[in-house]
Amino acid sequence: MKIRPLGDRVVIKKIEAEETTKSGIVLPGSAKEKPQEAEIVAVGPGGVIDGKEIKMEVKVGDRVLFSKYAGNEVKIDGVEYTILRQDDILAIIE
């Protein structure tokens, strides 16, 4: 199934945090931080919001950092994605 976000929304797939610390300690699921790094899976067309034209600055395949509690989580074909607005993306990782 293909997903096509509307407006200035993007669909991301979170990149899970490491399960082992640098010193080799294995973290249980409850101790891991909520992931804030993701890969862009789909990008909306942009559009006009509050009278301002919104140009999409991200593209499919970009790795990004996003606000920890941003967006709506959805499950499609057994895979978890998050749909959020471009404004919730903090940076592109190059």
From Swiss-Prot:
It is found in: Cytoplasm. SMART domains: Cpn10 (SM00883). GO terms for biological process: chaperone cofactor-dependent protein refolding. Keywords: Chaperone, Cytoplasm. One of its GO terms (molecular function) is metal ion binding. GO terms for cellular component: cytoplasm. The keyword Acyltransferase does not apply. It comes from the Bacteria. Its main location: cytoplasm. Belongs to the GroES chaperonin family. Together with the chaperonin GroEL, plays an essential role in assisting protein folding. The GroEL-GroES system forms a nano-cage that allows encapsulation of the non-native substrate proteins and provides a physical environment optimized to promote and accelerate protein folding. GroES binds to the apical surface of the GroEL ring, thereby capping the opening of the GroEL channel. Heptamer of 7 subunits arranged in a ring. Interacts with the chaperonin GroEL. This is Co-chaperonin GroES. The lineage of its organism: Bacteria, Bacillati, Bacillota, Clostridia, Eubacteriales.
